[in-house]
Amino acid sequence: MVKVYAPASSANMSVGFDVLGAAVTPVDGALLGDVVTVESAETFSLNNLGRFADKLPSEPRENIVYQCWERFCQELGKQIPVAMTLEKNMPIGSGLGSSACSVVAALMAMNEHCGKPLNDTRLLALMGELEGRISGSIHYDNVAPCFLGGMQLMIEENDIISQQVPGFDEWLWVLAYPGIKVSTAEARAILPAQYRRQDCIAHGRHLAGFIHACYSRQPELAAKLMKDVIAEPYRERLLPGFRQARQAVAEIGAVASGISGSGPTLFALCDKPDTAQRVADWLGKNYLQNQEGFVHICRLDTAGARVLEN
């Protein structure tokens, strides 16, 4: 039996639309991510468990984990009879890389079960392909950090899909999921087809400056450059209370904040534990909309997807 855990991730990080993402893990030790188990069997089966299992498609062939198994078998050129279990702990359409968690855990578990026939680059390419079936286009800003850990910059040149960017140990990521769903496809459809020249220049300056600040170890500058001129101005209308929440967390002391992925999760970066706690308390009282919402104080998950049992 192989059991794989794949962590939540926060894509875009305001400054890097479709090209930056970070894997995150709660500071209290809770596992924020999906788990997939693979066991040898006579025929294929898929069992869904976990807090959000009831939100998955009722038709098994529509389940992305089934599609991962099917695509993996196609890649190897043979049917691999296994019993798979998906522990769906991540809310769907949350902006926390929920589909990436399932895809990464499923493909990594299959690869481990079969003795690692695929290398990490090929596996990551498959992960992007499968996750793209849900989001509507192939992009790696959730699957790459989820699989490899840390903060990842998408390269997609010279057979390199992504590479790690050094993060800051003192940064605490407060993630607030309000409990409503925003589909990635809907959030992409709301964006303009073309952008003004000054927005393109500002975006390039922010992203280049952010990467420079990470490598030159300037956390205050990096946080200051986490600005979004590409998606947030258009997407915030999908997120009730988002603008007020951003203003409130800044007043409490967050050094940066924005939309996690395509939303509705809000991320707020803090450089002190007491500030992070106050931000989390405010968001818990004011940004959550129902019982399914939650707030976690996280750090970068530098390990990425990992085998829990083998």
From Swiss-Prot:
One function term, GO molecular function aspect: homoserine kinase activity
Highest rank taxon of the organism: Bacteria
Record-given protein name: Homoserine kinase
Top enzyme class: transferase
UniProt key word Amino-acid biosynthesis: yes
GO biological process: threonine biosynthetic process
EC number: 2.7.1.39
